[in-house]
Swiss-Prot record:
It comes from Chaetomium globosum (strain ATCC 6205 / CBS 148.51 / DSM 1962 / NBRC 6347 / NRRL 1970). This is RNA polymerase II subunit A C-terminal domain phosphatase SSU72. It is found in: Nucleus. GO terms for molecular function: protein tyrosine phosphatase activity; RNA polymerase II CTD heptapeptide repeat S5 phosphatase activity. It is an enzyme of class 3 (hydrolase). Belongs to the SSU72 phosphatase family. GO terms for cellular component: chromatin; mRNA cleavage and polyadenylation specificity factor complex. Component of the cleavage and polyadenylation factor (CPF) complex, which plays a key role in polyadenylation-dependent pre-mRNA 3'-end formation and cooperates with cleavage factors including the CFIA complex and NAB4/CFIB. SSU72 is required for 3'-end formation of snoRNAs.
């Protein structure tokens, strides 16, 4: 069941979730869970608040949220249904139930992050995200090409890796796909969001060091040769992170856009 803590960010945060940041280079991230509702959106929010460019997706065939019984889920289409419309529908159906199980809090948070749930398999990598300028984390993601994809469970990782293989690497650009096994509930999603930011900070430090060595223009081009030294460091960085977060098993692979 997907729930969330309803944290919509501080009042000091800009509409797109990012404050003015003087710390320099930032890797670009993508977070992925099944329905683009709980874990990926918690990660999306936390990374945006940490001034990382970020987008998020789900890998399921449909958006599924808990209903009045286990056999009566609330089902919606990706890319066509806004978080606000889902919020209003559930509030009209049974406000007590959906407030008690955390769905209204979750959707209230989500609708200030971006318009609605997006499906990974429908996403055109590298397509400019000109209609997403109000999304939190949108600054720096205008070109629509992340450096790191973080999934929240193994089946989502499998879906992302398989989809990238099927796409045939048209951009010939490396992307690190990392799975963090996060249980789909309120508390673990919050913990997982903090863990994502910790990992992002560690990866970004390594990237900045390697970028300084090869030059900003070369590194930022995103080619395999220009980022080889950073790519080689990712497993070590992830291993050090795993020691700090032993309760969140991780998996990694280098894939291609």
């Amino acid at each position: 069941m997907e729930t969330a803590n309803g944290n919509a960010g501080s009042a000091a945060t800009a509409q797109n979730g990012q404050q003015e940041d003087a710390s320099g280079f930032k890797l670009k991230f993508c977070t992925v869970c099944a329905s683009n509702q709980n874990r990926s959106m918690e990660g999306h929010l936390r990374l945006a608040q940490a001034n990382y460019p970020v987008i998020s997706f789900g890998t399921g065939s449909l958006v599924r949220l808990p209903g009045p019984t286990i056999t009566q889920p609330n089902v919606y289409k990706f890319n066509e249904t806004s978080y606000d419309s889902i919020y209003r529908e559930l509030e009209a159906k049974d406000p007590r139930l959906y407030r008690a199980n955390g769905l209204l809090n979750m959707l209230g948070r989500n609708r200030v992050i971006k318009w609605g749930p997006e499906r990974w398999q429908d996403w055109q990598v590298g397509m400019p995200r000109v209609k997403h300028e109000k999304d939190q984390g949108s600054i720096g993601m205008e070109a629509g090409v992340p450096d790191i994809v973080i999934t929240c469970e193994e089946r989502c990782w499998d879906a992302v890796v398989d989809d990238l293989l099927n796409r045939g690497s048209p951009l010939n650009r490396p992307v690190h796909v990392i799975n963090i096994d996060i249980k789909d509930n309120h508390q673990d999603a919050s913990i997982g969001g903090g863990a994502m930011v910790d990992l992002a900070d560690s990866l970004n430090r390594a990237a900045m060091e390697e970028r300084d060595k090869v030059g900003a223009a070369v590194f930022d081009a995103g080619g395999a040769a220009s980022r080889a030294s950073f790519d080689e460091r990712v497993p070590e960085v992830l291993g050090e992170w795993q020691e700090r977060w032993p309760g969140l098993p991780s998996t990694w692979t280098l894939s291609w856009f």
